[in-house]
Design a protein with these regions (language model features):
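Catalytic cores of secreted or luminal carbohydrate-active enzymes
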Residues: 64-115
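Catalytic-core regions of glycoside hydrolase
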Residues: 1-84
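A short linear-motif detector with a strong N-terminal bias
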Residues: 57-59, 86-93, 125-128
Length: 236
């Protein structure tokens, strides 16, 4: 894990499959199929994997279910849209291509939250949520996550850093995001709670297009890159 989350060259090299689901061994991509797929599946917790399709040889075109299972196992992040057209068209015609587009890479979802409605000035607030990743792959780059307190009265924002490492929100595993957040410096009043998951680079942190948008409906504020938790906290 320490090497996988590191910055060495080996921690930055991912995988590309040039003939995905095109033969029993993907045109020679694999020699020991089961062992090598298991290896890639584990490596893909830290580095991206993806590729493109090919004309099938000796096997039928992969079904939607087969492609979905394989992308999930190998934690796919990207798929070439230019090749191989007939395979991609089969997936489009069977109404699974749109799902693949949604699930490639990470897809972070706030599954549930238990949040108190009141807190005391200079006290603390307990953030108690469950986060899911319903995409095929984890987040690979470090991000800075903040709980945002936005005053209902005038829109003033108070930004509190979390210790949350979003890279550890893995596919198909509930992640308990529980942190005690200091309310020091936030005056009494009513506050909307929002979550900002911004880029780690200073030059990109204020650009909303580099912030992570949760997959929940009606929560994204695109102008600022904020996710509305749809909860109001009274500090008194």
């Amino acid at each position: 894990t320490s090497e996988g989350y590191g910055t060495t060259d080996i921690a930055r090299v991912g995988f590309h499959n040039d003939c995905f689901l095109a033969s029993t061994n993907d045109y020679g991509t694999y020699q020991n199929v089961a062992i090598e797929k298991s290896y890639i599946s584990q490596e893909a917790l830290f580095v991206p994997t993806g590729g493109e399709t090919c004309p099938p040889s000796g096997i039928p075109t992969a079904s939607c279910a087969t492609a979905d299972a394989e992308m999930s196992l190998l934690k796919w992040t990207y798929l070439n849209l230019d090749y191989y057209g007939p395979v991609l068209e089969v997936w489009r015609n069977n109404s699974c291509f749109t799902n693949f587009q949604r699930e490639l890479g990470y897809r972070i979802l706030l599954k549930s939250a238990s949040l108190k409605k009141e807190a005391t000035v200079n006290g603390s607030f307990q953030l108690n949520t469950i986060v899911d990743n319903v995409g095929f792959a984890p987040v690979y780059n470090t991000k800075n996550t903040f709980l945002i307190f936005r005053a209902v009265s005038d829109g003033t924002i108070y930004k509190k850093a979390l210790n949350f490492d979003i890279r550890k929100v893995l596919p198909v595993v509930d992640y308990d995001l529980k942190e005690s957040v200091s309310l020091s410096g936030i005056p009494a009043g009513n506050y909307q709670l929002l979550l900002k998951i911004e880029d780690n680079y200073d030059t990109l942190s204020d650009r909303p297009e580099y912030s992570i948008q949760l997959a929940n409906s009606n929560t994204w504020e695109s102008s600022e890159g904020l996710n509305d938790l749809q909860h109001t906290l009274t500090i008194n």
